[in-house]
Curated annotation (Swiss-Prot):
Protein name according to UniProt: Cyanate hydratase
Assigned EC number: 4.2.1.104
Molecular function GO labels: cyanate hydratase activity; DNA binding
Active-site residue list: R91, E94, S117
Length: 150
């Protein structure tokens, strides 16, 4: 049996999650993995261990082809290269357009010439209640990797 396409994999996982009435936060509790990481797995941007894939398969009632596909090494960052049109995703694009260079400068002033890893990395999303309207708090924590001189 051929491996499901990334879009089929995502659609199958989302349908199974919806059918079980689960949120990513529910899956975090059940699997012991962060909800953002689990969501990245659903979108084909992460790889599950055999144990993680089996646990998710049992929880969601996944078929063997989907379970096997979760264990494959994905092509990361394989989103459409055009400017995103989804309003929420576009805001992150807009944030990088406005604050990308300032953020780069501040990071390099504090750490030197290098980058923030997206491999040795965590991403957390929290809800901050505010009487003027709830706020979204996104925390990125990546290892600093200095550029090597040779």
């Amino acid at each position: 049996m051929a491996a499901p396409s990334p879009s089929t994999l995502t659609a199958s996982l989302m349908a199974a999650k919806k059918a079980k009435g689960l949120s990513f936060a529910d899956l975090e509790v059940a699997l012991g993995l962060d909800e953002v990481w689990i969501a990245s797995l659903f979108y084909g941007q992460a790889t599950a261990s055999p144990e993680e894939a089996e646990k998710l398969a049992t929880l969601l009632g996944l078929d063997p082809a989907i379970t096997a596909a979760l264990q494959e090494f994905p092509t990361k960052g394989s989103l459409d290269p055009v400017i995103p049109t989804d309003p929420l995703i576009y805001r992150f694009y807009e944030i990088m357009q406005v604050y990308g260079m300032p953020l780069k400068d501040v990071i390099q002033e504090k750490f030197g010439d290098g980058i923030m890893s997206a491999i040795d990395f965590t991403l957390d999303v929290d809800k901050v209640e505010d009487p003027k309207g709830d706020r979204v708090k996104v925390t990125m924590c990546g290892k600093f990797l200095p550029y090597k001189k040779w």
